[in-house]
Amino acid sequence: TDLMMPGEQSPVDEIIAGVKNGRISETTLNKSVKYVLKLISKSISNKGWEYNEAPDLAANAALARRIATEGMVLLKNDRSFLPISQGAKIALFGATAYKSIAGGTGSSNVNKAHITDISTGLEKGGYTLSNRLKGLYTKFVEFQNDLLDKHPESTDWEKLSYNRTVIAEMDLSKAESIIGQEAKNSDIALIVIGRGSGEESDRRLEGDFYLTPEEKFMIENVSSQFHAAGKKVAVVMNVCGVMEMNSWKDEPDAILLAWFPGQE
């Protein structure tokens, strides 16, 4: 590691002491300094760029959108299912589709002017979403948000709102008939799986590295009922970090790893 997170004097004191007592060689230290300076030399501030109060926000937004798109990874695409035909009617499943994750937590979080949810992006792209599912999930997301907004006493390091960066998944086992109805009335199904991610910790196993019971039910039953109707299913992963996929990757026809795509 050539660069540590700045902010405290203690690491600086440790490095100086390490060089003085011989635990760290000056050659090793100079090598790290060289790499950091090399990185700085490549920055735009070192190439004549001047700060201004009127950045080209439209160009920056277009660049952010292009980078997000180019960074996505198509993990599976049986019989070239994706891209979806323009104007298709989509049954959009998954709470994260209606409250999508733009970035991570902690130091990976940045201020965002807005967040374009996956549902909104699809509609702007000319696709038609199931109004039934849109209404159902919108109410569910509002209810989940209320759990945080109406309980400020739960805001601290250990309680609900600090640890809750992703909307919980809706339990479709209590409304299984909706899946069959959507399989009849929609052209395809998209399922969105979401996971938060931040620094200084690994994933828990149950319900984090592995799918939750609600997510398993959703993928299995949406896939089986849409396939029975001769229609295809894709899973979009709005995640950052590792997840177990081997147990369910054969269910959908396509899997797109969208990562955390930012505000656009």
Residue ranges of model-derived segments:
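Hydrophobic faces of well-ordered beta-strands that scaffold small-molecule active sites
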Residues: 2-5, 233-235
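Long, well-ordered, tryptophan-enriched scaffold segments
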Residues: 7-8, 14-47
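C-terminal non-catalytic regions of proteins with extracellular/luminal or membrane-system context
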Residues: 11-24, 58, 62-264
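Flexible, acidic loop-helix segments that line cofactor/substrate-binding pockets
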Residues: 45-60
